[in-house]
């Protein structure tokens, strides 16, 4: 263990005497080096603050000159926080004495992490009320600094269910209707977490029922997450609304004075909210803050029922909520009709939404139809662009796959993938997950068929080819973006999945016309000139063993001679270069694949091409490999190649004296 690591470990473990022994008598330069970042990215001061070692913190700052602002990496709840200052770490862990000490020694109260999280947000996240009070009350920490997602301290307090912190922030003037980058408010966070008491608190401070970027109100957010208590509270009939036929109160639309809707109408520092939800501001009832229309209540109950089907797996509970929704639709003799679907969907087995009480009651004998109803309801209310819509379609497909109904699974997954590609940005994580699921499913089914023979489930060319075509389309869409996707891990993964689908296509029978279609699609991919990590082309990736690791479950095995041949047949350049000037031949040599090397050479790859380190592919072959002795590089070297290497070796100037295509040939060597 080196001295730097020993200092870090002593600070982490709170061993002050050992730390003093290691650091005493050191020069300023040595102290700066020893109290700086270690290999993991943290500093001794940061880790001491993280674990609350006050004496170590003060020693490092006062005696060793450690910077109270130096950020680093620190671990919390299984996550690595980058660029965290010591004050952030102490606040997140709730060490009030360390927080006081660091602030007395000049730490900035609003200094943020790499994701723009402040010490105040860190304290709010884990519910450290005393730290929050100290940061705000004694040092005027900014309540409104949001993280990179636009999520504020009030929002995270609501989401985590820290009622007293939320109350305190509101008393200090936190903006109750502030919106995040995705348009959600603190009310949405309460609804998603099921924090009814905090939701009542916010409504008492004039929180508005806004729609977020997906068109979701807090009421719908509660339905999606299955928080029945929030839904029941928000849809209860409101006093003072107009009466409908039959003498029952009908919930009406919100009537709110805009002048009082921008948070708590109190000066900063004045008490904003009452001491309990039963004592609202200005004598107003909480109910008057959140009247809900009949249509909104119906949709909330229908969506809640869908959540009971798919998330809670409670079909009887779902029926109960759907019955209430149906009663509301027919309330007072004025029927609220459902919109007619533009067309029936094969993936849903051509199901229609029920429209009468009789149709609804008939569902109790058909659980599968109930599950289709849940998918139909969710798509109607949330729309195709909401992540939950496609997520639960895929979830239902996975359930079918688990029971061996792969055909039904594939239909649902294809429908979800079409929905994602039509509504989400290219290479969104959800779309990438869909492609990977397809590859893993196809691999499993093809292995199952091989094991069971004709009894296995049939996966045909059309299934694989359909997904491959969509994968190539996704790459084309990504390359049309204004930013360059080549360095994106998601883009590399998309290319790898396409190669795995090509690998699997070898295992299904193809007619000549289908083979032609496959080659056309691969040609489209190559024409895009996509590049993955380190500038890898698809041909580089096909000869690299790391391409095998694409998900949790095995799909194809790489390097793959079959995939290499398909790519070469479709026009892949065997002399293409990555960022280190490696050709696919170099990568094949690094992976000890002489058979693939021979295929590349036969396709015109230059055996004597050198990479950025002036190594040929032959020189990269494992010396212990038997095939190295059988490969004769000079059998593939032309006189032209030797001349090019001689020019390079002797540093003979050639640029401007020969044609440009010859210049490129010399640079290859």
UniProtKB/Swiss-Prot annotation:
* Pfam families in alphabetical order: Ank (PF00023), Ank_2 (PF12796)
Q: Quaternary state and partners of this protein? A: Component of a CRL2 E3 ubiquitin-protein ligase complex, also named ECS (Elongin BC-CUL2/5-SOCS-box protein) complex, composed of CUL2, Elongin BC (ELOB and ELOC), RBX1 and substrate-specific adapter FEM1A. Interacts with PTGER4. Interacts with NFKB1; the interaction is direct.
Report the protein name in the record.
Answer: Protein fem-1 homolog A
BP GO annotations: negative regulation of inflammatory response; positive regulation of inflammatory response; proteasome-mediated ubiquitin-dependent protein catabolic process; protein ubiquitination; regulation of ubiquitin-protein transferase activity; ubiquitin-dependent protein catabolic process via the C-end degron rule pathway
Supply the source organism for this entry: Homo sapiens (Human)
Protein function = Substrate-recognition component of a Cul2-RING (CRL2) E3 ubiquitin-protein ligase complex of the DesCEND (destruction via C-end degrons) pathway, which recognizes a C-degron located at the extreme C terminus of target proteins, leading to their ubiquitination and degradation. The C-degron recognized by the DesCEND pathway is usually a motif of less than ten residues and can be present in full-length proteins, truncated proteins or proteolytically cleaved forms.
Keyword list, A-Z: ANK repeat, Cytoplasm, Mitochondrion, Phosphoprotein, Repeat, TPR repeat, Ubl conjugation pathway
PANTHER family with a match to the protein in the record: ANKYRIN REPEAT CONTAINING, ANKYRIN REPEAT DOMAIN-CONTAINING PROTEIN 16
Domain of life according to the entry: Eukaryota
Q: Where are the ANK repeats?
A: 2-31, 40-70, 82-111, 115-145, 149-178, 182-211, 214-243, 534-576, 580-609
Q: Outline the segment boundaries, as ranges, of region: Disordered.
A: 240-278
Gene assigned in the entry:
FEM1A
A single Gene Ontology CC term: cytoplasm
Protein modification: Phosphorylated; highly phosphorylated in myoblasts and myotubes. Phosphorylation at Ser-108 promotes PGE2-EP4-mediated inhibition of inflammation. Dephosphorylated by protein phosphatase 2A (PP2A).
Expressed, tissue-wise, as follows: Present in macrophages derived from peripheral blood monocytes. Also present in atheromata (at protein level).
Residue ranges of the TPR repeats are 298-332, 390-423
**Recorded coiled-coil stretches:** none
Where does it localize?
A: Mitochondrion; Cytoplasm
Q: Its annotated pathway?
A: Protein modification; protein ubiquitination
Q: Which family does it belong to?
A: Belongs to the fem-1 family.
Positions of post-translational Phosphoserine modification: 108
Q: What induces it?
A: Frequently down-regulated in rhabdomyosarcoma.
Among InterPro entries, the record links this protein to: Ankyrin_rpt, Ankyrin_rpt-contain_sf, TPR-like_helical_dom_sf
> GO MF terms on file?
EP4 subtype prostaglandin E2 receptor binding; molecular adaptor activity; ubiquitin-like ligase-substrate adaptor activity
Task: Write down the Gene3D superfamilies for this protein, in alphabetical order.
Answer: Ankyrin repeat-containing domain, Tetratricopeptide repeat domain
């Amino acid at each position: 263990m080196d001295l730097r690591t020993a200092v870090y470990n002593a600070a982490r473990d709170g061993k002050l005497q050992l730390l003093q022994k290691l650091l005493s008598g050191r020069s300023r330069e040595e102290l700066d080096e020893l109290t700086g970042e270690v290999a993991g990215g943290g500093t001794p001061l940061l880790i001491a603050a993280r674990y609350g070692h006050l004496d170590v913190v003060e020693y490092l700052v006062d005696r060793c000159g450690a910077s109270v602002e130096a950020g680093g990496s620190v671990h919390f709840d299984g996550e690595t926080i980058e660029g965290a200052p010591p004050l952030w770490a102490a606040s997140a862990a709730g060490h009030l004495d360390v927080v006081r000490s660091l602030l007395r020694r000049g730490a900035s109260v609003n200094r943020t992490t790499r994701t723009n999280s402040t010490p105040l947000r860190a304290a709010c996240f884990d519910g450290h009320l005393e730290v929050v009070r100290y940061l705000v009350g004694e040092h005027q920490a900014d309540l409104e600094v949001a993280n990179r997602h636009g999520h504020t301290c009030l929002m995270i307090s609501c989401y985590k269910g820290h009622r007293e912190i939320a109350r305190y922030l509101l008393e200090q003037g936190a903006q109750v209707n502030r919106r995040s980058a995705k348009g959600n408010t603190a009310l949405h966070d309460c609804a998603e977490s099921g924090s009814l008491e905090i939701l009542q608190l916010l409504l008492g401070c004039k929180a508005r029922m806004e729609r977020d970027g997906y068109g979701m109100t807090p009421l719908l957010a509660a339905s999606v997450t299955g928080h029945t208590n929030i839904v029941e509270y928000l849809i209860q009939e409101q006093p003072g609304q107009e009466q409908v036929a039959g003498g029952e109160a009908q919930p009406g639309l919100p009537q709110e004075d805009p002048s009082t809707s921008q948070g708590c109408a109190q000066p900063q520092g004045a008490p904003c909210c009452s001491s309990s939800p039963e004592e609202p501001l200005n004598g107003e009832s909480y109910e008057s803050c959140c009247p809900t229309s009949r249509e909104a209540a119906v949709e909330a109950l229908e969506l809640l029922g869908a959540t009971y089907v798919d998330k809670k797996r409670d079909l009887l509970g779902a029926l109960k909520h759907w019955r209430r929704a149906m009663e509301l639709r027919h309330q007072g003799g004025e029927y609220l009709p459902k919109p007619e679907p533009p067309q029936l969907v094969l993936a849903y087995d051509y199901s229609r939404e029920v429209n009468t009480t009789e149709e609804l009651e008939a569902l109790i004998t058909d659980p599968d139809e109930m599950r289709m109803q849940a998918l139909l309801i969710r798509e109607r209310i949330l729309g195709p662009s909401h992540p939950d819509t496609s997520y639960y379609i895929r979830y239902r497909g996975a359930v079918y796959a688990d029971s061996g109904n792969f055909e039904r699974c594939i239909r649902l997954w294809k429908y979800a993938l079409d929905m994602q590609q039509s509504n989400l940005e290219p290479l969104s994580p959800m779309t990438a997950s869909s492609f990977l699921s397809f590859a893993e499913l196809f691999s499993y089914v093809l292995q199952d068929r091989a094991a069971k023979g004709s009894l296995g489930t049939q996966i045909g060319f059309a299934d694989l080819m359909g997904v491959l075509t969509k994968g190539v389309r996704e790459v084309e869409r990504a390359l049309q973006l204004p930013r360059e996707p080549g360095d994106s891990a998601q883009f590399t993964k998309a290319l790898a999945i396409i190669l795995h689908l090509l690998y699997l296509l070898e295992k299904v029978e193809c007619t000549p016309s289908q083979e032609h279609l496959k080659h056309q699609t691969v040609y489209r991919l190559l024409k895009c000139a996509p590049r993955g990590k380190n500038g890898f082309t698809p041909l580089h990736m096909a000869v690299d063993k790391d391409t095998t690791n694409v998900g949790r479950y095995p799909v194809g095995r790489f390097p793959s001679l079959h995939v290499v041949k398909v790519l070469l047949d479709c026009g892949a350049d065997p002399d293409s270069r990555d960022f280190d000037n490696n050709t696919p031949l170099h990568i094949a040599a690094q992976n000890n694949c002489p058979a693939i090397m021979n295929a590349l050479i036969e396709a015109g790859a230059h055996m004597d091409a050198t990479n950025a380190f002036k190594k040929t592919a032959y020189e990269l072959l494992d010396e212990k490999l038997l095939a190295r002795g059988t490969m004769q590089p000079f059998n593939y070297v032309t006189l032209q190649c030797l001349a090019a290497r001689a020019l390079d070796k002797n540093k003979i100037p050639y640029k401007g004296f020969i044609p440009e295509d010859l210049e490129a040939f010399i640079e290859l060597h």
